[in-house]
Amino acid sequence: MNRRLRLLAVAAFLAAWPAAARPAPLAPRRYELDLAVDFKEERIAGSARITLENTGASALSEASFLLYRLLTVTAVRGSDGAPLAFSHNVVAFEDDPKRQANQVRVLLTPPLEPGASAVVEIAYGGYLAGYVETGALYIQDRVDEAFTILREDADAYPTVRAPSFESIRAAPPPEFDYVARINVPESHVVANGGELVERTVRDGRATYVYRNLRPAWRMDFAIARFRTLEAPGLRVFALPQDTAGAERVLRAAGACMALFRGWFGPLQDAPAFTIIEIPDGWGSQADVTSILQAAAAFRDPGQMHELYHEISHLWNVPARDASFCRWNEGLAAFLEALAAEKLDGTPTLDAQAEKVARRLRERAAEDPRLRTVPMIDYGKAGMTGDSYRTGMLMFYALYRLAGPEAFNAIVGGYYREHQARGGTTADFVRRSETIGGPGVAPLFQDWLFTTHWLDILASGAKVRELANRYRP
């Protein structure tokens, strides 16, 4: 059988794989991303060279990647440049039929042995149109000269996973290095939380080369006519109409980071930190060295608490739980309110906790699962959005029960002990119970491991008195 027929036969085999194939234990260890952005045609094109490691116990003969449904794969090659057999088909997520992606299935030849690594280079191009129709309202990603963002939320680059939210939640978060070359018109700036290695200009186009500062779990590249502001250890990319607000954001970020350092200790191996402005409604979020911050914080001083929320995530550790319930979002929601009270000088923490309690009671009427699914299982149940509120009240009660000094020792000590290798919910609970006193165990029993918290709220208990339930 000649080479062409052999490749066709293998491709036919790949096309016959079941759509619900589960992800193999493949971990991305390095990305080399090379993309050009064409505003006139509203498309991107380029390649992603991905180093994969088999973290499992048996050899693997295939890999599954996801791309946005309007991105087309033109070639797949190995480390030596030889073509690899592949198929790519637009498929629906098995647990969310509204969500569609281009699943790229690649045959690994020879099979990848346990502990071994291989390189897969995927050439692709096409369009982005977001995922708003799926209910993910913040994923409005598209190629537009006013603002463009390339991120994993919209599958703008190949991610190593299968089309199943259950399997994605169950997998540990990736950790990888990256080098990215993003080519844009000279008038535009590419913003990223990594180190800018170089910027070169040729024929009216600029190529920005970034590399990560710390092991990354995602890559975000925002493109606009940004203005850049810098201070020691901080960098802000602001949309051109918000330059004045960027000065305020820079000052507030510095004050907030100083506050958290005083509470939890310094960030370990702290690199320069980057804040990137994005339009409202596009989803503020943080990674290990940067924040995507919605424009509201740049335009309205009253919305600066959103920035405090994202900055608090810098003191998170990599979660090692399977199907993590994301209680760290509840911690961030609490620290957001606490920092706003301390930095703004107005006593708003108790009022914010009361507001969250009212909304939780409303949510329980809307979603009966809250009556039966404890927060520890929110990840398995696809309910992590509820961790923001349930977790906020849990940490509010813990803070009032243990007191500020013990609370800071819990959070800061957990960060210092587990930042390098990650930690689990069980690790955090053990530390909290050791430092926080005898009332912490029943508090976690009510708020984390059972749904008794709902009975407490339904009884009309005052939120300001929650901690009293757990005092000796």
Question: Residues of each region from the PLM?
Answer:
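Bacterial N-terminal signal peptides that target proteins for export
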Residues: 1-9
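Acidic/His/Gly-enriched intrinsically disordered linker/tail segments
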Residues: 325, 329-397, 401, 418-419, ...
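A surface-exposed beta-strand-loop module
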Residues: 70-140
